[in-house]
Every structure is written in C-alpha cells, then in structure tokens.
C-alpha cells in the first residue's frame, strides 16, 4: 500500500515501556510507504485541538533515530486523558479537528493507546464517514491493563506483568534474609 498524503499520529493514556516502539513502527512504516510528512500530536487529541503538533520527519532522519525512539521511556509525544464528547453534543470540536487535519493535508490518522484512545478513533472515524472525509483512522492498541475488547494481549501488558513478577521475586528474596 502506498500512502499518498500526510500522516498524523498521537499517543494518549498512561505510558508503557513500549508505547514509543509503536510510535516508531507507525513512523517508519508511513515513511517506507511514501508518506510525505508524518506529524506527531503533542499531548494527544487535546494537543491537536490546541494546534500543538510537530513534523516528526524533521526530527527523525536516520535508522539510529528510530532505534533510539524505540528505547525512549515514557511517551515521546506526550499524552492526555482528554475524552472527546459525543458528536451530537459538540459538533464544533469535530469541525475544528477536521479543519486542522485538512490544513495539514492528513490522509492517515493513527492514535496509540487503550480504551479511551480507541473510543476517540471510533468517534473520529464515525464523524469522517458522516462528513464524507477520505481520511483513514486507525487505532494502535497499547495498554498495561490488557482490557481491550477482541484482543488476546496488547503491547504494554507483558512489560507490566514482567515488572510485577520481578518486583514480587525481589520482595520474597528480601523477606528471606531474616530469621
């Protein structure tokens, strides 16, 4: 698939140790498939509403940059917990988002996160259909809770489970040092 047009990607919800790996994957795939520019939303959909975005194509130029991004802790682009209102309750918010996406010539919209992020993608996709937009909206699942419907597991869950298991092992070992 050739990606004609520009891409935008955002992160939301709690950070995991792998959220930036997902971001690196979206960026690399978009560039490999011909996307002109890959924009990153600063602080998720809330940042987009505030017109806070960066041209990631200017920041990530080499394979080493991508590898470093994969290993960067926390959320590289920043996060938010902002929930989009229902379309019927606040059409103006959606109009503003789509105006910004049109200005940036966005054809592909990726959002990395858990349940609320997937809800955001669904609402934007539904509004896009309603308005006749040709923007493709895709959710990239990431959650330490492993509670997304119709998924066996998500990136982030294994890291959290390993952390808890390692911590418990250390607590048990510490407890064994005393009589």
Regions from the PLM with identified roles:
Residues 21-26, 115-132:
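Short Gly/Thr/Asp-enriched flexible loops that form oxyanion-binding sites at enzyme active sites
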Residues 38, 125-154, 161-163:
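Short, acidic/small-residue loops that bind anionic groups at enzyme active sites
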Residues 19-20, 50, 120-122, 149:
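Short glycine-/acidic-enriched loop or helix-start segments at secondary-structure transitions
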Residues 51-107, 116, 144, 155-169:
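Glycine-rich oxoanion-binding loops at beta->alpha junctions
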